[in-house]
Amino acid sequence: AVLFPGQGSQQVGMGAELFEARPDLLGSAADDLLGWSLRSVCLEGPQSELTRTDRAQPALFAVAYALWDEFARLLGEARPSAAAGHSLGEYTALAAAGVVDYFTGLRVVAERGRAMADAAARRPSGMAALLGCDLETAEMIARVRRDDGGSLWVANVNAPGQMVLAGAEEDLEWLVTHGSELGARRVTRLNVAGAFHSPLMASATDELRESLHTVAAALPSFPVWANVTARPSMVSEVRDLLARQVESPVRFSDSLEDMAATVDAFVHVGPGDVTAALARRSTSGREVLVVNDLSSAAVVAEYLQQEIG
């Protein structure tokens, strides 16, 4: 199975060799669609520019897809039996499976980034990771705050013992103060500028639904697990699931556990190695590999061909 990262994996310098290898995907056509220089933002930054939600999302989608396309070429006849992506990464997974074409995906992801940034700007908000905390405890903590009039929800189910909550700024301050006494081993604020995957993103859902309305979805060449349901998405429901995703919890750990029933290896494709770490924590007895540049793509492709052969 192939796994694609989401927002937070962006780093200045990512994809440097891909900009040389794949100008068809990362060159002027992408810049014209986005209205800004993908190469400049990815390679020159600064990091504060690349971290902006409306920049990070299309940049990560483009670089991860270009890397996937090179990796797929190196794989030859070998093909994944499944795919998933964390949040934004679900779009990369769908493009990799041929459900949407690359430039359509890039357009929708750019609109998604703008819509989520706009929603976040309406109210100071953010996210925090709870470590050493199961889903039941995380939901209880969020419910305690909501029962007291607050705005706090479970946003990511990343791995056993790793949950993420999203909420308004004052609710996150409350969480940092009271999280430990309510059952979390540690509470860590995340460097994101919004309460993603929570009801505070409702306006982004509405905008995204409009953007997705014109998107034609094709049959996937391999199944893609949806964040909202933690099961393979059907073509007829792809647009609805993607619209709902921005204000629904990312059930990534559940997806990995479900996929592990039918796959024996996970391959992270894209900048960083976040989904590989989550796969190691969420499954056991499965090989986990990382493709985050062209050299690792060549090594992993050769290894997988030998294993399959």
Give the location of each predicted region.
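Short glycine-aspartate micro-motif
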Residues: 1, 83-85, 105, 154, ...
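Acyltransferase/transacylase module recognition
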Residues: 1-74, 79-80, 213-309
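Catalytic nucleophile loop
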Residues: 6, 83-92, 197, 270
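Alpha/beta catalytic cores of group-transfer enzymes, especially the acyltransferase/condensing modules
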Residues: 7-9, 34-36, 97-249
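A short small-residue
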Residues: 43-50, 92-93, 186-190
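Gly/Ser-rich oxyanion-binding loop with an adjacent helix/lid
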Residues: 57-129
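Short beta-strand scaffold positions
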Residues: 62, 85, 166-167, 268
